[in-house]
Each structure stands twice: as structure tokens, then as C-alpha cells.
Amino acid sequence: LSVCFLILFHGCLASRQEWQQQDECQIDRLDALEPDNRVEYEAGTVEAWDPNHEQFRCAGVALVRHTIQPNGLLLPQYSNAPQLIYVVQGEGMTGISYPGCPETYQAPQQGRQQGQSGRFQDRHQKIRRFRRGDIIAIPAGVAHWCYNEGNSPVVTVTLLDVSNSQNQLDRTPRKFHLAGNPKDVFQQQQQHQSRGRNLFSGFDTELLAEAFQVDERLIKQLKSEDNRGGIVKVKDDELRVIRPSRSQSERGSESEEESEDEKRRWGQRDNGIEETICTMRLKENINDPARADIYTPEVGRLTTLNSLNLPILKWLQLSVEKGVLYKNALVLPHWNLNSHSIIYGCKGKGQVQVVDNFGNRVFDGEVREGQMLVVPQNFAVVKRAREERFEWISFKTNDRAMTSPLAGRTSVLGGMPEEVLANAFQISREDARKIKFNNQQTTLTSGESSHHMRDDA
């Protein structure tokens, strides 16, 4: 099964599917969007942005936000599209079940009579802890669950890449539930929203009893005829699973990251199916300032997560950027060469301007905490913090997303001859030199010497 799974993954690597219909990205106005639908469950809520909005249709993605209360369990589910999950706040644990991979977490055997008695000790696949700032990657069709073991709510934002080649259905985001009776959070527009059911509900009870070799009474429990929904409270105020202690888990995570760093440093690669699938890294934290790729004191930082430092992203054809700007700081104008950028405000608010291929300003406003903004591929964008710190995360639809700056030391204009700029803009060569060399920052700059962005279109 592991071999088949590997072949399936490699068959999905070619490229994102060309789902876009003609004129689907002919957008003359962008908006910072709040979720359109909200569903409340026993131990949490699920919110979704309308996947049929023109911004999300252009980018080929769907977005959902989960809030899980303490001791809440997000029931097992999978999707028709690969997912990137960003943990906005909270901590907990998650299980991601790959077909064909061994159950490496096992309870200790109680005596040698266990096999003779016919009773089995529990065993399951690896459980991963998560915390604020973690990115969790989940391929299409892979089941996962999530549990809040902290004292405050867990909030996550999930991108579903419905245009990805791993999705061979249509562009409708689908959640397939293995338990519970959750509603379809993406179908708010339907006035008569049908009650959700899990996959087992659709099968014949007798057939399932034969498949599991249990009685029909137990199968009826699998069909979950209750009203708790998709996020439920765990009995006894604790989810009892097999896992290392917190200190052991943290040490293991650190040693795993050090091992990966060492392999990258010496150019080594993992080899073997078990290492590629069953023990691959699915999680990385991008909230630590020490991991910043671009950092300017008192201005801000940018941290990039792509297929170079989390290899599974090559399979998913996705990447992520985390940004932090301090008061009045600026991300220099740029465009994304090979991806759409889906911006989610994590903290504070920032001023953003986006310009299309006609030179029209299609967005000029604020992106606040909890809002989403799509910046289509090649549209130029600039971000600026206002009177407070602004934090955001950008999901990008390419595993090695690239940007091209319009200003600064590495800008596209800086790579052109002065004479070209002088003739293009009808300016002197001295002014052309100012355009090329006045700002020697590469990506981030302080707002002290810059003028406010004006409405001088």
C-alpha cells in the first residue's frame, strides 16, 4: 500500500490543474472578506468564506476557520483537496492517518497471555503536538483529527487548494466525515441546508457488520445518530491516547528539526518509502523570530516555508509566508511571479494596495485581524502597518513561490540601465540613479523617511 501511495503522490506532482475558466480572474475590485457562514457545534465553531466568491474562484482555493474549545475534539475527516492549516492560537494534538503506514504508537503488553486471551492493546499511528504558529500539511484524501488539550480555545485557518492536481473532482470543496453529523459549512447559500451525515450513514448496516465483524448494534453507533456535530466534548475531561510525555515530545521535535537541518547542510536526502511517506515531516513552526528569512530591527520580519524546508509542500504545490510589521513599517511594492497569494490577518491591521495589469488600484484599504484578501498572480501589492503592529500569513499556490520587488536594492528597476529608465519615465539620468539606488533595503523599510500612501490615482 505504501508503494501505491507513493506512486499516487508522484502522479500528482506535475502541476496545478488548469481549472480556471475564461475570464475567471477578470477582477476589477478586491475586498477584505469576513467569513460568510458559521456553524456551531457542541465544543466549537466552524466558519467558512464563500468558495464561489470571484476572488476565491480566481485563486482556486477555499478557506475555513475552526475554533475548538478546551477539551474539544474535531472529529476525523478528510477532503478532496490538499490542505494547509495555520494555528492562529492555542495548543493541542492531531492525528494524521496515512493508508498503509504502521501503527507505531503501541500500548505496553500486559503479560504474555494477551495473545491467548484474544484481547488487543491499543495501537495507532503517530500523534503530533501543535502550538501557535505551526503549519500542518495534509494531502488530499488523508484523514485527520484534532484535539484541544490547552486551557484556551484553539483557532486554526485552513486553506483547501481545490485547483490542485490532487483533486480530480470539481472545484467544490468537500469534507468527508468519518464520524458525527456535521453540516456542510460551505453551503450557506442553500436555503434548505440538509443535515450532514458521516460516511458510514450511507452504507447498509448488515454489510458494515460483516465488514467490521461486529454486531449491528455497534454499527448503528458508527452511524452517529446524535446532534453533537463535528466538534465534540471529550469524556472525563481528557483524551487518553498513547504518546510521549510533553518533555520527551518536545525533545524529539527539536532533534528531528536538527537532523533535517544537518541533512540539508550536507546535501543528504532521505531514502526509502517508509521515510518518504510514513515518517515524513508534516509540521513546521514559522512564528519563531529566530527563523526569520528577512529581518530588520524595529521594522519587521518575513519567514518563508516552502518545499526546500518542508519537502511535503512539493507534493502539495503550496507554500506559506508569515509577516510581521511594526508601526509605520512597509513591505516594498512587489508582485508574485508564479502564484496567487491569499492573505489572512492574524493580528492588528495593515494598509494594503493592489494594482492590476491595467494600472488600476483594485484594492486600497485595511486588512484586519480575521479578514482574508486574495492577491492574484502578477498583481502588484504593497503592505504597510499603521499605528500598531500588523501580523499576517500568506498562503501561496506554488511550492517555491517567487516575488519580484518594484523598489529597493534588488528591484526590477534596479536591474535596468539608467538610460532605459531615463527614457522610459522622461527623467534625467540623475533622477534615474535616485530611483535605482536611493533605497538600499531589499524587502522591508521603515516608515520614518517615507511618505504616506496617497489617493492620487
UniProtKB/Swiss-Prot annotation:
InterPro entries: 11S_seedstore_CS, 11S_seedstore_pln, Cupin_1, RmlC-like_jellyroll, RmlC_Cupin_sf, Seed_Storage-Functional. Residues 29-37, 31-48 are annotated as: Conformational epitope. Residues 41-55 are annotated as: Mouse monoclonal antibody (mAb) 4H9-binding. Can be used as part of the diagnostics for predicting the risk for positive double-blind, placebo-controlled food challenge test (DBPCFC) in cashew-allergic children. The risk increases with higher specific IgE levels to this protein. Residues 395-416 are annotated as: Binds goat polyclonal antibodies (pAbs), but buried in the 3D-structure model. Residues 34-57 are annotated as: Mouse monoclonal antibody (mAb) 2B5-binding. Changing residue 54 to A: No effect in binding to mouse monoclonal antibody (mAb) 2B5. One of its GO terms (biological process) is protein homotrimerization. Seed storage protein. Homotrimer. Hexamer. Each subunit is composed of an acidic and a basic chain derived from a single precursor and linked by a disulfide bond. This is 11S globulin seed storage protein Ana o 2.0101.
